[in-house]
């Protein structure tokens, strides 16, 4: 069995006549945090969305938890032991924190989610409750389950969004700008949270805050113009003359 949770091999993505990603290869191994950085338009979000099955792949392969696919579908991520957060929070404001977290256990498309948020099998309800409780504990929000999501401060909502992604017990967690919109103190708190999460769950993150990337990542891939132009540890990347951090 492979030691890689994620392997992106020679991936190319095209939109019309534009090549958004060109022959990109990255890996994520158990027990590590891997960062994707680069300027706006470098291809970070496109790569992230390709892994999540949100954009079609022109060529190359993705191996997710030992399953090789040409183009994963978003609803298949749970079966592949992968989960993700969205930019911002994406919580349902009229639902409680606990209800929002439970939604993360659903295997859904956008339409099916809106039609039936809580179409859970009754026999699984106890297990779901336990997993949602554990997910909230992992983000230090176990006392907030009954509160309305939109009543919480934005930094706390970010934690709830991560808990929702954790409820399916993923081996690999994809974090889309976890520090986005946070102040300095909350960014430090997020750094600590990510380090604690990687004990049980490997992480691939896209992030513009370099203090987060340098603090929490074991390895970093630098993208520009749709290509990986550098790869290494935080110290190795920091010392590259082409990277101004």
What positions do the PLM features span?
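ABC ATPase "signature
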Residues: 231-232
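Conserved small/polar residues in nucleotide/adenosyl-binding loops
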Residues: 244-245
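The feature captures the beta-strand-to-loop junction immediately N-terminal to the Walker
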Residues: 37-39
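Catalytic Walker B motif of ABC-type/P-loop ATPase nucleotide-binding domains
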Residues: 173-177
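A short, surface-exposed alpha-helical micro-motif characterized by mixed small hydrophobic
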Residues: 213-215
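Conserved ABC ATPase "signature" region
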Residues: 112-150, 192
């Amino acid at each position: 069995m492979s030691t890689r949770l994620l392997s992106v091999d020679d991936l190319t993505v095209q939109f019309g006549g534009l090549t958004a990603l060109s022959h990109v290869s990255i890996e994520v191994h158990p027990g590590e945090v891997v960062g994707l950085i680069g300027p706006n338009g470098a291809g970070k979000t496109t790569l992230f969305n390709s892994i999540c099955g949100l954009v079609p792949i022109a060529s190359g392969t993705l191996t997710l938890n030992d399953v090789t696919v040409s183009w994963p579908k978003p609803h298949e991520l749970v079966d592949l032991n992968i989960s993700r957060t969205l930019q911002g929070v994406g919580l349902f404001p009229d639902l409680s924190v606990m209800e929002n977290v439970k939604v993360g256990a659903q295997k859904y498309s956008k339409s099916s989610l809106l039609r039936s948020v809580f179409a859970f099998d009754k026999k699984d309800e106890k297990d779901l409750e336990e997993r949602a409780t554990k997910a909230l504990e992992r983000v230090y929000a176990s006392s907030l389950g009954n509160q309305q999501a939109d009543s919480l401060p934005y930094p706390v909502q970010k934690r709830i969004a991560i808990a929702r992604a954790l409820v399916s017990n993923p081996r690999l967690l994809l974090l889309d700008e976890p520090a986005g919109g946070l102040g300095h103190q909350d960014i430090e708190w997020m750094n600590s949270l990510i380090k604690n999460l990687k004990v049980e769950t490997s992480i691939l993150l896209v992030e513009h805050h370099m203090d987060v990337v340098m603090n929490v990542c074991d390895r970093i891939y630098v993208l520009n113009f749709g290509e990986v132009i550098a790869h290494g540890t935080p110290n190795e990347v920091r010392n590259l003359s082409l990277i101004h951090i």
